[in-house]
Amino acid sequence: MTFHELLNEAKERLYQAGQGEQAAQVLMVEYCRQRNINLYMEMDQPMPEDLEVDYLEAVHKMELGQPLGYVLGYECFYGYDFKVNEDVLIPRPETEELVGLVLSLYDDKFSDKENVQVFDVATGSGAIGISLNLEEPKLNVICTDTVSYTH
């Protein structure tokens, strides 16, 4: 099957599963990016068999209700990619607003201080604490969680 045919099939399958058609496009773009395939140049070409198998397996996981972030293994948060799996919650867009609010409060009230401590308790993927520290290196961010292993 061509990239185009597989994309159309995946769109229909995910639409029927209530996941939305856009996830099929995101999956295909990401899987092609990982393999240095220019999707837009290859749309009418047959998809390599190994990629087809991986892509359809990912579509099937989403049909079963697995979120896109878990299927891809990462989620974008505040412009940064964070590893996610079933052990952590996927960061939500609303939480990005929280990071923006904390950074704004820092600018308004604490920017003249040299050592401002921030604690990110139950950090999960680390998205909040790491994003805060990347955006404002003056913050001394401490992240903690109860999970004692990593993947």
Where are these predicted regions, by residue range?
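Conserved AdoMet
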Residues: 29-105
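Conserved class I S-adenosyl-L-methionine
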Residues: 114-122
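Conserved small/polar residues in nucleotide/adenosyl-binding loops
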Residues: 150-151
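Conserved SAM-binding loop of SAM-dependent methyltransferases across substrates and taxa
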Residues: 127-137
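Alpha-helix termini
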Residues: 105-113
